[in-house]
Amino acid sequence: MVLLVSNVFIIDRFFPQDALYPKNRAFVEQLSSIDAAVPSFTLLEICGVAGFRLSTKELESWLFRFTNVYPVLVLDAFGLKGQDAEEWWSNFVGEVAGGITRKMTLGDAVLLREAENYGPEAIITWNTKDFSRRTQVPVMTPSAFMQRN
């Protein structure tokens, strides 16, 4: 499994003039053959950004039926099931704070927390610098992932 960062979906839906769009689109077209996932927190981040440009109906589709929009798995927050909420929250905040102290945005720190717990094959993003030297999980662009696979 690979974890996808929000920029893959934002570029695909809203930035067809972006220089990365053709490569990004080629990657998105391959998603059905890739074991790809999006953490639930990343989905909320995506929808927070997209909400300014989507109709209410389309935004609801993204929020509650994202797997109908893109062929990816939406992951539950790691460790939430079977744990006391207070204990989970304390662990979650500590792990996310660890990312923030490594000079990461909140969204990237949350995704990194999920990645380091789920143990994916790679984190896929166009902004590899956001994760480089901050994790042992391999980080690559969609193009690099497609070339490798």
Residue ranges of model-derived segments:
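Conserved beta-strand segments of alpha/beta enzyme cores
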Residues: D35, P71-L73, P138
